[in-house]
Amino acid sequence: MVTFEVFRNEVLSAMNSKPKKWRDGQFVFNYIDEKYGVARSVQFIDGVDCFYVDSKIEEFIARSYEYIKNAELSDNY
């Protein structure tokens, strides 16, 4: 299990490869959705949507991490 800071840095570093026409939040949403599959849970269950609202990126990353961490913990039991 990676730490939150490692996860956050991974996502933010990946933004260096985002398409120029994409907003940061759009990239973060798609990156997390493609790599971890939790973006729609954060968007629809938690109501945090960085796809359209870039100011929600940090909260979106934090909530995504919680879903990933909880999934990994439940896989270990």
Segments (PLM) and residue ranges:
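Acidic, low-complexity, intrinsically disordered interaction modules
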Residues: K20-A62
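A short glycine/small-residue-enriched secondary-structure motif
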Residues: Y67-I68
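Low-complexity intrinsically disordered segments
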Residues: E72-D75
